[in-house]
Structures are given as C-alpha cells and as structure tokens.
Design a protein with these regions (language model features):
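A generic transmembrane-helix signature of 12-TM secondary carrier transporters
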Residues: 58, 62-65, 80-81, 174-181
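Glycine-rich segments within core transmembrane alpha-helices of 12-TM secondary carriers
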Residues: 109-140
C-alpha cells in the first residue's frame, strides 16, 4: 500500500489538474512522516511486540488509502499521503521479527533477503496496481482518458485501456491490507 500512488501519478495529475510542484508534494508526503513514525513504531514494538503492532499498522493502512481514494481536492490528497507515510514505518517491524526468528549467524542473510524483497515490492506494485485499476473499471470512480492510453510496465507487453479506476485500486489495496492485518494477528506469533 505504501507504493500505491506512483503507478497512478500521471492519471491523478491529469484528473486533478495538478502542477508539477503539487505532484511532487504528494510524493514527498508519502515519506514525510515515515522517519518519526519508525521511532514510534519501534517504541510500540518494544512494548507490545511485532504481532500486535504489525496487525494494527496493516489495519490502519486502510484509513489513508480510503482518504486518498475518495479525495476531491489537492489538500485531501496531501492528507491521505501524509497519513500513508506512517505505514512506511512497517519496515521496522520486519527487522525486529527477522532478528527474533533467525539464529544470530543467519540474521544478516535473512535481513538482506527481507530488505531486498521489500524493495521489490515497489516494482511489483507498479505492475499489479495498474492491472488492479484496469480490472476494477466496472466499478464507480473510473477515470476516462477519452481515448485509449498505452501502459508499458517493466518487461511485460504494453496494453491499452481507455479507463483506469485508480480510486478503487488504492481503496482496495487498503482493504486487502486491513484484512491481512486481521489474518496476521490470528496466525502469527511474535517468536517461533
């Protein structure tokens, strides 16, 4: 969910008539609260453990997604992305869990894999979020380009679509995160 804005940036800029500075502000807001949030999440981890902290963070992720997806103004987009920056603090939880779930001689490798696959998430979301947005065009909120737009994502074949439902895709990613947060709470333990 933290990476769900960039795949739709061009569409959102076009729909809202944003200036380049406004588009950049929205991107900056996505990380603006991440650093202080990582400190707060770290303190919550120490007090409540990774299972509860991560579950609540995933459930919380639905809130900024729904705010951003239902935005009607630049200011509402900014608020949604600022609140989304807190979700970026989830990285801290994975570091802690990796350290607790693996023996000391394997923690470095495990955290390297965790960090590497975490970065892969940004590239993967560029593909999946657009596909999700196209698949949800039958729902209200689709943005009509007026004529087909071509999308080329990574090494996959280009495709064209006249409609892209970025709002439902972003809202849907938040809802999926919240559902996964509930699943996580009932199926994961803090330590092995």
């Amino acid at each position: 969910v933290w990476f769900n804005y960039p795949p739709f940036k061009t569409t959102i800029v076009q729909e809202f008539g944003l200036t380049p500075a406004q588009a950049g502000t929205i991107g900056l807001c996505n990380v603006a609260l991440t650093v202080p949030a990582r400190i707060i999440i770290g303190m919550l981890l120490d007090r409540y453990g990774p299972r509860l902290t991560y579950s609540l963070l995933l459930i919380y992720a639905a809130i900024p997604c729904l705010i951003f997806a239902s935005a009607q103004s630049f200011n509402q987009l900014v608020v949604g992305r600022l609140l989304m920056g807190i979700v970026g603090a989830g990285f801290v939880i994975g570091i802690r869990m990796t350290a607790e779930w693996f023996p000391p001689k394997e923690v470095g490798t495990a955290e390297g894999i965790y960090g590497g696959w975490g970065n892969f998430g940004s590239a993967f979301s560029a593909f999946t979020m657009v596909i999700f947005g196209v698949a949800l065009t039958f729902l209200p909120g689709g943005f009509n380009f007026g004529e087909p737009e071509t999308f080329k994502i990574l090494f996959f074949p280009a495709f064209e679509t006249p409609v892209l439902n970025w709002r439902m895709a972003i809202a849907g990613s938040g809802i999926i995160a919240a559902l996964y947060g509930m699943f996580y709470y009932f199926n994961v333990t803090d330590t092995p």
